Amino acid sequence: MEIIDAHQHLWDLDLFSFSWCRGIQQLNRTFLMADYLEAIEGMDVEQTVHVEADVDEPFLLAETRHVLQQSEQDNPLEGVVAGGRPEHSHFKDYLDQIVGHPKLKGIRRVLHTQPDDLVRGPWFIQNVALLERYGLSFDLCVLARQLPVALNLVKSCPGVAFILDHCGVPQVKEHILDPWRQHILEISKCPNVVCKVSGLVTLCGAPHNVTNVKTAVMWSDY
């Protein structure tokens, strides 16, 4: 079966800084396309979508351009979801510097590390709404408790396509369904949202075995 990996990460710590991963031994290392190709060998992955990995803000534009350049090389990278900071007044200027590349598909702002008020700020909704004009989607990277905030953003920008990452990060390991279940049902009624079934095995915790895969499949039914 041919596979499209819709959530690929790459990072080069020799070029860019990702402060969030410094304390995580498994992640605090450079991982390039060559490493990825080795990891997927024999898995029939035909295409991939690179999703930004919350690079430190001073490197945001340079890292986005770097990934877009990689997508022009001989590899399966067919789509790029770039990082962005819609809370800033200069967000449109940033977009104008990266739009036009055929592999650029969307923007993501990691929100699970940010206060909820960031999304309610004067620029955030206005700037996310701009994405409709550029034909770009917006990835919702939120915790389960932030789903109501995400829902408000979705309803405020009806012309923008939203991708809910990792099923809204339910508490899989703790087997706590509610209020995540109620919120996921509400957001599922919005025609401009699709849900990315990703990250659930990781949310199950270690070990990553068949039992946890079965648990992840059960949660994805919602």
Predicted regions mapped to residue ranges:
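Short amphipathic alpha-helices and their capping/turn segments at secondary-structure boundaries
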Residues: 1, 37-38, 92-100, 148-155, ...
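H/E-rich (His + Asp/Glu) clusters that bind or coordinate divalent metals
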Residues: 171-222
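An N-terminally biased module of ancient metal coordination in phosphate/nucleic-acid-related enzymes
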Residues: 1-68
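A generic "structured core" feature
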Residues: 2-11, 15, 40-41, 112, ...
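Loop/turn elements at helix/coil->beta-strand transitions in domains of secreted/extracellular proteins
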Residues: 45, 103-105, 160
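Catalytic metal-binding/acid-base residues of hydrolase active sites
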Residues: 9, 54, 85, 168, ...
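Active-site gating/metal-coordination segments in enzymes
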Residues: 61-146, 152-155, 194-203, 207-210
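Short, electropositive alpha-helical surface patch
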Residues: 58-76, 160-164, 212-222
